[in-house]
Regions:
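Acidic, polar-rich low-complexity tracts and alpha-helical solenoid repeat scaffolds
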Residues: 1-236
Length: 236
């Protein structure tokens, strides 16, 4: 049947997205996009059209057309909110907005994943990027909450913030402590850190928050502030 032919073409085109050596074949993604478009037009009620849209968006990314990929992802989000691809798609949308400095829109996309809960494999990464989206909007009071939530999530699955994680994770955790310290610095300094932990409870990684803030002040030659941070930590 025509439908089976189209689906066979789509399957074949999926295989063309990358060559045997992992290198993209220039004609492959474009051919795939046309096949996906035919499926969507001819069979609008096909039960796997969320997968068709997902593959179509990836194909647009393959040929360097992120704006077109975004249009397809927006359609997937609108028409298939419970698709198995939805959290990845929300994250990719968040990244699209973030690199274009549309931080409010990025906040919304990352937030959609957090609403889904910790069962999403993108949950922790979304917390991290949401913290950055808030920080970029100068929402310094909100950003630390998201970062702390990310650290809490890591600890809940047995991760020790004091241990040596894998390189990519180490960068994320180190960056988290750094931007939390920057947020507190923008809010006023050591007394703000004290108030935060007094209000929200002590954290096992509080020493790293104080330490990073102290190092930040020291690097800026703000020696009195640095000393004040270390004194606050000792007193807490």
């Amino acid at each position: 049947s025509q439908r089976q032919d189209l689906l066979s073409d789509a399957s074949a085109d999926n295989d063309l997205l990358t060559g045997a050596g992992g290198e993209p074949i220039p004609a492959g993604p474009r051919e795939a996009i046309e096949t996906y478009r035919k499926i969507l037009e001819t069979y609008p009620n096909y039960e796997r059209n969320d997968q068709v849209l997902y593959q179509m968006s990836r194909a647009y990314d393959e040929i360097g057309q992120p704006d077109e990929a975004m249009k397809v992802m927006d359609r997937l989000v609108a028409e298939y909110p419970y698709s198995k691809y939805i959290d990845e798609v929300h994250f990719r949308r968040g990244e699209y907005y973030f690199v274009r400095k549309k931080y409010f829109d990025a906040e919304s996309a990352y937030g959609a994943i957090i609403t889904m809960g910790s069962t999403s494999s993108y949950y922790e990464l979304a917390l991290y990027k949401l913290g950055w989206a808030l920080y970029k909007q100068e929402l310094y009071e909100d950003a630390p909450h998201r970062y702390m939530a990310m650290l809490e999530q890591r600890q809940s699955v047995g991760y020790d913030c004091g241990e040596n994680p894998e390189e990519s994770e180490e960068h994320r955790v180190t960056d988290t402590f750094r931007v939390v310290s920057l947020s507190f610095s923008n809010l006023g300094g050591p007394e703000v850190v004290d108030e935060y932990f007094d209000e929200h409870g002590h954290r096992s990684y509080a020493d790293k928050i104080y330490g990073n803030l102290g190092e930040f002040y020291f690097s800026k030659l703000r020696y009195e502030d640095a000393a004040s941070v270390y004194k606050s930590f000792i007193n807490h």
